[in-house]
């Protein structure tokens, strides 16, 4: 009879186990891979940083430009245009003035022109001053912003110092008014009450 009872219990347990569905979760790293496929942006900051770097690598670099610096302030724009005109018409030009000198930037459709301008005018004397001519690679705006944000974040982390150091527990302060209340609320002993009652009756 005990054997039959055990068989009944075993069968009922097997039936309940077969009807019960067990949910098995996949590994977290595999589940996270479904986010981009479903159109959800990755929540991990490292993933966003990798995506941004990947996009920047895919973007083609900007065309190189020529920079002419240390130009005397009394040199006119027309003089600079005449100097560049012999190499063709630039597709981009900009002139910057500061307190000491001028700087102009040019971009040409033919990159080989840049080398010729450097050979022709680097160290060229203009109004008793030697100008400097160089070829440089301009950066995209978001690249400069990322570099600025990284420097800013580093400065903030250095300013914070040790993590958690700015969370300081302030000591509990009790005002003088509360101290007075605490003294008044102190329970009086039975002997003191009897003494006060005797003094009141005698008086």
Curated annotation (Swiss-Prot):
The keyword Iron-sulfur does not apply. InterPro entries: FoP_C (IPR025715), Nucleotide-bd_a/b_plait_sf (IPR012677), RBD_domain_sf (IPR035979), RRM_dom (IPR000504), Yra2_RRM (IPR034396). GO terms for cellular component: nucleus. Residues 1-60, 137-203 are annotated as: Disordered. Residues 47-60 have a biased composition (Basic and acidic residues). Residues 139-153, 163-180 have a biased composition (Basic residues). Residues 64-138 form the RRM domain. Residues 11-20 have a biased composition (Polar residues). It comes from the Eukaryota. GO terms for molecular function: DNA binding; RNA binding. GO terms for biological process: mRNA transport. The modification N-acetylmethionine is found at residue 1. It is found in: Nucleus. Keywords: Acetylation, DNA-binding, mRNA transport, Nucleus, RNA-binding, Transport. Transmembrane segments: none annotated. Involved in export of poly(A) mRNAs from the nucleus. Recruited to the coding sequences as well as poly-A sites of active genes. Associates with mRNPs. Interacts with YRA1. Belongs to the YRA1 family. This is RNA annealing protein YRA2. It comes from Saccharomyces cerevisiae (strain Lalvin EC1118 / Prise de mousse) (Baker's yeast).
């Amino acid at each position: 009879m005990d054997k039959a009872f055990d068989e009944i219990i075993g069968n009922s347990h097997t039936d309940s186990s077969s009807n019960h569905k067990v949910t098995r979760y996949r590994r977290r790293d595999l589940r996270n891979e479904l986010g981009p496929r479903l159109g959800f942006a990755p929540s991990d900051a490292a993933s966003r940083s990798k995506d941004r770097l990947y996009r920047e690598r895919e973007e083609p670099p900007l065309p190189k430009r020529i920079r002419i610096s240390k130009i005397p302030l009394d040199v006119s724009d027309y003089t600079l245009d005449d100097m560049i005109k012999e190499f063709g018409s630039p597709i981009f030009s900009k002139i910057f003035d500061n307190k000491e000198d001028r700087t102009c930037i040019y971009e040409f459709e033919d990159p080989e022109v840049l080398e010729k301008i450097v050979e022709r005018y680097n160290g060229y004397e203009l109004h008793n001053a030697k100008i400097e001519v160089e070829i440089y690679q301009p950066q995209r705006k978001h690249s400069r912003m990322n570099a600025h944000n990284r420097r800013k974040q580093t400065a903030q982390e250095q300013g914070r110092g040790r993590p958690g150091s700015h969370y300081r527990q302030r000591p509990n302060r009790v005002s003088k008014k509360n101290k007075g209340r605490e003294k008044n609320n102190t329970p009086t002993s039975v002997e003191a009450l009897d003494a006060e009652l005797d003094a009141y009756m005698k008086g």
